[in-house]
């Protein structure tokens, strides 16, 4: 958390071997049929989503979300892109500029900033020390190949474990503070 007011959290769903999508860019493996009876009840996703002030994502993640079915509702969504994209969604804003200025505005305006992807966006936010936390939902699958979430990250970064929860659906959520 920065200044006690806002948090920028990088979130990802990943296979146990660290991939966020298959080689063909599919994410059909996100639906797990695993069962872990000793796990915590599956989280109340709807209640959690109400705590997010805005989403931040790259254009590839945005385009994937449109193809799969928009799950972000009317929550403000900022899409980082160098391309000239258009949308009919009133809550989507395209941005190409200084990330420090953008994050300052988003922290002030929305408080909770949830980085929904992708790998290049996450790497840049960590490199610039603009993100506060990383939340990884590890799914019970090994993909062997595809896109790794931290594929573009090229430096050492120390983290502090904030918590871990194993859920009944076999997903393990791990939360880290990014040490600055």
Task: Please state what every model-predicted region is.
Residues 1-180:
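Enzymes that bind and transform nitrogen-containing heteroaromatic metabolites
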């Amino acid at each position: 958390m920065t200044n006690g007011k806002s948090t920028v959290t990088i979130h990802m769903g990943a296979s146990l071997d660290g991939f966020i999508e298959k080689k063909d860019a599919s994410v059909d493996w996100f639906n797990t049929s695993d069962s872990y009876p000793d796990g915590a009840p599956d989280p109340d996703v709807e209640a959690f989503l109400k705590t997010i002030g805005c989403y931040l994502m790259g254009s590839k993640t945005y385009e994937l979300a449109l193809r799969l079915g928009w799950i972000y509702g009317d929550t403000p969504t900022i899409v980082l892109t160098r391309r000239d994209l258009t949308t009919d969604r009133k809550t989507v804003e395209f941005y190409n500029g200084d990330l420090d200025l953008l994050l300052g505005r988003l922290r002030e305006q929305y408080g909770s900033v949830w980085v929904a992807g992708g790998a290049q966006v996450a790497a840049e936010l960590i490199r610039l020390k603009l993100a506060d936390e990383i939340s990884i939902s590890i799914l019970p699958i090994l993909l062997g190949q595809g896109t790794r979430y931290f594929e573009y990250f090229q430096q050492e970064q120390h983290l502090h474990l904030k918590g871990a929860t194993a859920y009944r659906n076999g997903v393990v959520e791990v939360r880290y503070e990014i040490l600055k």
